[in-house]
Design a protein with these regions (language model features):
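Short, charged, solvent-exposed linker or helix-capping segments at domain edges/interfaces
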Residues: 143, 255-257, 292
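Short, structured protein-protein interaction patches enriched in aromatics and acidic/basic residues
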Residues: 232-249
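A short, sequence-level motif marking secondary-structure junctions
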Residues: 245-252, 283-289
Length: 296
């Protein structure tokens, strides 16, 4: 079975490496030299050069070159993991068994953008690692493999990413063997897209901490946006922004204090009143610590 692999993030690297180690025939790779779009961008060329895999780099206007490359390689299946662009119909029609996409959510729920960030911010207790046959929609194709992944209260974007990657790589090896045995007759489950939802693109404002939020909401926001992502932030009275990387929920006896009031300073840690309790800011980028009694 001939596979062309498309991807440009850390999961792409782990998946490609696993396919190579398990002896699958990777006849070509399409990737990017650099991406400012993906916080988890990963260079695949150490693998492609080591194993002498023909590689084409995505550029701004080389779609025709990509199509020619794919037709020349004549793959049975294309794996497209960690790619921001929706593939056109012409590419989807090239491989015999279709193009396999990946989405770290429990499809048909939670299609769309930033699935790990939204899942953590919303306080979900579970998500999923889902592979599907791509169509012209966004995350709407027939599902070929789905495994539930538990989200712990202590999980951050980084730890959840790692958990899902470990699960997803095992899934991929299993269904790749199924493809070799069954080809296009591999089991597929059609999505009921009317029953699901789609998450929107996040904006900068979505990462802003407002202490009128609950302690739980602030805690979830910070752990959703911590490394390798952009980080949650505060906007101070002088319009300066401060990145916040880690917070701890704290009980609060200051019921009459307003949200945003600095209740205590302990070393480099800042205790701040929230709507329903308090948050201790543990890791941050304050150039100068606020004073007790100040408002953030």
């Amino acid at each position: 079975m001939k596979i062309v692999f498309i991807g440009t993030v850390d999961f792409s690297y782990q998946a490609l490496k696993a396919l190579i180690i398990n002896g699958f025939d990777i006849v070509g790779v399409i990737t990017k030299k650099k991406s400012d779009f993906n916080a988890d961008f990963c260079d695949l060329t150490p693998l492609t050069e080591k194993y002498h895999i023909p590689t084409l780099f995505r550029k701004k206007d080389n779609e025709e070159e990509i199509i020619s490359f794919l037709k020349e390689k004549n793959p049975d299946v294309i794996y497209c993991f960690g790619w921001s662009q929706i593939l056109p119909a012409e590419i989807l029609s090239i491989p015999k068994f279709g193009v396999v996409g990946f989405h770290p959510a429990e499809l048909p729920n939670n299609r769309g953008r930033h699935p790990l960030i939204w899942a953590i911010f919303l306080g979900l207790k579970r998500t999923a690692s889902t592979f599907f046959i791509m169509d012209e929609g966004a995350d709407t194709g027939d599902i070929i493999s789905q495994e539930i992944v538990t989200i712990e209260e202590s999980d951050t974007a980084a730890t959840l990413y790692k958990k899902i990657t470990e699960v997803a790589v095992k899934q991929m090896i299993y269904f790749s063997k199924e493809f070799e045995l069954k080809g296009e007759n591999i089991k597929k489950i059609k999505q009921d897209i009317t029953a699901g939802n789609s998450w929107r693109k996040r904006g900068k404002i979505d990462g802003q901490i407002d202490f009128r939020m609950s302690s739980e909401a602030i805690y979830n926001l910070v752990r959703a946006l911590t490394h390798p992502y952009i980080g949650a932030h505060l906007v101070l009275s002088d319009e300066k922004e401060v990145k916040i990387w880690k917070v701890i929920k704290k009980s609060c006896t200051f019921a009459n204090s307003e949200p945003g009031k600095v209740l205590d300073i302990e070393g480099n840690k800042i205790l701040v009143k929230t709507y329903n309790g308090a948050i201790q800011i543990v890791e941050h980028e304050f150039l100068e610590l606020p004073k007790k009694g100040q408002y953030l």
